Design a protein with these regions (language model features):
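Active-site pocket-lining/capping segments in soluble small-molecule metabolic enzymes
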Residues: 7-175, 180-212, 230, 237-338
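Hydrophobic, aromatic-enriched interface-forming segments
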Residues: 224-227
């Protein structure tokens, strides 16, 4: 009788995995010949292990692309202008930007509207960051050394209202994409989108600060209305492949991370990450720390210089994907964005 499982060695999989385990030829799962937990996970449509077979994702963006480029920290109009100039020089299209890391509240309506108009003309989707909110209100837990582990949840109803008004101001200035880091707020926004209380084409990107790192959690966010999710930045390819097997929405994966958040550089892995986790937004965000990069008083020239580095690194990512995974393609420049 031929077994449906192919036994593999420790070297073949990952350090520390017991050699009595095996990889399923059908699913790529690593399992210990059934456990109660494995049965429970499968019964709920979840994988029973990370995908050590690194199964290719069957999903793509609607234009056929495996991945798109996302650059964070586009703080004001002059930063966007520098990004566009460098993109033209390096022949790389930036599909999406995360804007106003220091908080959209700190830009006036004229600045916000001009930014939205230029991004739309340039076929770039914007994810606008509201605030500053959590960590800048009167609550101190979120800033304490151990309180940071609780995440950036919104404290109380007043802060919920302030935040939602911030989102409404962003929508009124012409943006459609927003960053969300509280599951309750995500549910409120999704309900409002369904009810027509906010634009029906609003886009919700769930922040890495929610701390999700497995298929069950990201499937939950998808059900709450997330349009893409940024899982924690240090997930291996088997973990990302397992997440992809459970959800349909794009994953936002850091290709370069700022130093205070780990400083990971995954440029050489990008092609294979896109192969197993497509559709993927590759986030390019080198730098020192949020505290240095995203505050309201830093000089505009700092961001203009830094964003040029981010575009250069994005061009290198495209080059390395092409050289390492010839079957993986980047999305073309879109004809329009919301």
């Amino acid at each position: 009788m031929t077994s449906s499982r192919a036994v593999v060695s420790l070297f073949d999989i990952e350090k520390g995995v017991n050699d009595t385990m095996s990889i399923s030829q059908q699913t790529g799962e690593l399992v210990s010949y059934e456990t109660g937990a494995a049965a429970i996970l499968r019964s709920q449509g979840l994988p029973a292990s990370d995908d050590y077979a690194l199964t290719s994702s069957p999903l793509r963006f609607d234009d056929g692309g495996h991945y798109r480029i996302e650059i964070s920290g586009v703080e004001r109009l002059s930063t966007l202008e520098a990004l566009l100039d460098e993109s033209a020089k390096r022949n790389v299209h930036v599909h999406r930007i995360v804007a106003f890391g220091g908080g959209a509240t700190l830009l006036d309506r004229g600045e916000l509207t001009a930014f939205a108009d230029l991004a739309r003309e340039s076929k770039i989707q914007v994810i606008a960051v509201p605030g500053p909110r959590t960590g800048w209100d009167t609550g101190r837990q979120a800033l304490s050394s151990e309180g940071t582990t609780a995440g950036r949840r919104v404290r109380g109803v007043d802060n919920m209202r302030f935040l939602i008004d911030d989102y409404l101001r962003i929508f009124e200035c012409g943006f459609r994409g927003v960053l969300v880091w509280d599951e309750g707020i995500l549910n409120v926004l999704n309900t409002a989108r369904t009810a027509g209380d906010i634009p029906e084409d609003a886009v919700f990107k769930v922040s890495v600060y929610t701390g999700y790192a497995n298929p069950a959690g990201i499937k939950l966010l998808e059900g709450l209305g997330a349009d893409s999710v940024n899982p924690v930045g240090d997930l291996g390819r088997p973990m990302l492949a397992a997440i992809r097997s459970s959800v349909q929405i794009p994953l936002d994966v850091w290709a370069m991370t700022f130093e205070s958040f780990g400083g990971m550089n995954r440029l050489w892995e990008a092609g294979d990450i896109a192969r197993v986790a497509a559709p993927v937004y590759f986030k390019v965000e080198p730098g020192e720390s949020e505290g240095v990069m995203y505050n309201a008083w830093i000089e505009p020239e700092f961001h203009e210089k830094l964003v040029r580095h981010k575009v250069r690194h994005s061009a290198i990512l495209n080059e390395l994907v092409t050289s390492t995974q010839k079957s993986v393609g980047v999305s073309p420049t879109p004809t329009r964005v919301s």
